[in-house]
């Protein structure tokens, strides 16, 4: 496994994309017949942060959203809410490899970007220009591609105020100069792109990712800064430990049967507590109202568990759970929070989402649904096409009771550990 990312040049990437389209009728190995073609009358079209979304789904901040070609591939397959990989001031981190284990449920020891801050910005700018160019070249309807780039930043206010992060936030707010240069490169292969008005602002919204153990006043200070000083619609990524030790363990170990996955006491000890989260979220909703912005939560982060599998380096004492078992935990957390806020808390959902449960998540009130673990399985980005097929059956204004769905997830065979499943009597 390679130890370092080495992004290719913009001219090489653009040549690859447009030449492959002309010579093979495919892009990045995806044949044209599998491109998602948006429809104006699609039942799943929606909005977030005052932007139109052709679909409410996309890749979660993670391995799928670090390089331009990955972002473009996900867009071609129907992703329209794209969470960009988390960027932080420390951009020379040593990531243990392998860092992802997805034999079934997911475990990882990876965290923020593996590129320099300026390299991350460049990747996102390339993807932005390519998406706008391909939207026109492929003849898709609408003047704009109906896509939202959701920034992800971390991990504390001191880091976000560092010069490289200040430059990054400035660049995402106005990348006109670099966007213009990239449009010129694209025009060498597709001259009509020069006639497009590709926006210089890549994003006006952000998800705050904080370290485990970040105190509520720090989370509140960072979020307030992002709204008051940066004018960004803001989501706070919450940890599943917010459900509390009894809530998490009863679902994970008892209901779902993942008895090997041990959530240590310290995970609950250093993470944000529910009693502290509620006043914090109320305060931040008030700040958002004062700023004329939207504020909400992303549910959820991964779950800290003891490293019991022989995959990661022995020095990794903890690893982070994702995928199937996290779904039930996070849905039950969503139910608890929405009960607290009378269903008015803006929520983006990312925890064990798949093609079958995504319509349910939209119907219980999730504004967007993002995916990571499921995309790391066979099919990759093409799995998004089945998500959209399932969303086609979504009735306008369809609503499902969140409390009932939360209860259902605790015994859903698709979430239960395979070693915990028992055959019906007639099959024995």
Report each predicted region and the residues it spans.
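N-terminal capping/small domains of soluble enzymes
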Residues: 1-223, 229
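Glycine/Thr-rich beta-alpha phosphate-binding loop at enzyme active sites
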Residues: 27-40, 244-343, 378-393
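Structural preference for beta-strand elements that scaffold enzyme active sites
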Residues: 56-58, 81, 146-154, 233-237, ...
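Active-site beta-loop-alpha junctions enriched in small/polar residues
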Residues: 62-64, 87, 239-243, 300-304, ...
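Glycine-rich phosphate-binding active-site loops on the catalytic face of alpha/beta enzymes
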Residues: 83-89, 364-386
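C-terminal helical cap(s) of enzyme catalytic domains, especially alpha/beta-barrels
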Residues: 94-106, 377-399
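Catalytic cores of alpha/beta
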Residues: 353-366
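Conserved small/polar residues in nucleotide/adenosyl-binding loops
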Residues: 419-425
């Amino acid at each position: 496994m390679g130890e370092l990312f080495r992004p290719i040049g913009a001219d090489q990437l653009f040549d690859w994309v447009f030449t492959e389209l002309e010579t093979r009728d495919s892009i990045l190995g995806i044949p044209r017949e599998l491109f998602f073609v948006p429809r104006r009358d699609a039942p799943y079209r929606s909005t977030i942060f005052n932007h139109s979304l052709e679909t409410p789904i996309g890749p979660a901040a993670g391995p799928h959203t670090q390089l331009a070609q990955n972002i473009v591939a996900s867009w071609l397959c129907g992703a329209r809410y794209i969470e960009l990989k988390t960027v932080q001031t420390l951009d020379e981190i040593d990531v243990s490899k392998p860092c992802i284990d997805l034999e079934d449920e997911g475990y990882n020891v990876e965290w923020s970007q593996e590129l320099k801050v300026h390299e991350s910005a460049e990747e996102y700018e390339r993807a932005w220009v390519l998406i706008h160019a391909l939207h026109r070249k492929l003849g898709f309807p609408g003047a704009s591609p109906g896509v939202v780039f959701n920034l992800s930043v971390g991990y504390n206010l001191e880091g976000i105020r560092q010069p490289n992060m200040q430059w990054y936030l400035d660049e995402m707010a106005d990348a006109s100069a670099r966007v213009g240069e990239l449009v010129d490169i694209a025009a060498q292969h597709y001259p009509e792109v020069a006639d497009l008005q590709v926006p210089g602002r890549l994003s006006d919204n952000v998800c705050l990712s904080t370290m485990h153990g970040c105190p509520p006043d720090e989370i509140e200070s960072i979020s307030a800064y992002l709204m008051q000083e940066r004018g960004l619609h803001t989501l706070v990524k919450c940890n599943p430990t917010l459900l509390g030790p009894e809530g998490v363990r009863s679902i994970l170990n008892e209901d779902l049967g993942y008895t090997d996955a041990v959530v240590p006491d310290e995970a609950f000890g250093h993470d944000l507590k529910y009693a502290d989260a509620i006043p914090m979220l109320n305060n931040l909703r008030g700040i958002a109202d004062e700023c004329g912005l939207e504020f909400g939560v992303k549910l959820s982060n991964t779950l800290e568990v003891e490293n019991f599998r022989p995959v990661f380096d022995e020095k990794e004492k903890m690893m982070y759970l994702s995928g199937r078992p996290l779904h039930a935990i996070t849905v039950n957390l969503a139910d608890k929070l929405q009960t607290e806020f009378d269903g008015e808390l803006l929520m983006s959902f990312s925890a064990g989402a798949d093609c079958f449960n995504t319509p349910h998540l939209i119907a219980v009130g999730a504004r967007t649904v993002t995916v990571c673990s499921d995309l790391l399985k066979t099919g990759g980005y093409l799995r998004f096409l089945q998500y959209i097929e399932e969303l086609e059956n979504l009735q306008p204004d369809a609503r499902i009771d969140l409390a009932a769905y939360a209860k259902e997830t605790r015994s859903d065979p698709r979430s239960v550990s395979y070693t915990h499943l028992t055959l019906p009597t007639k099959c024995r």
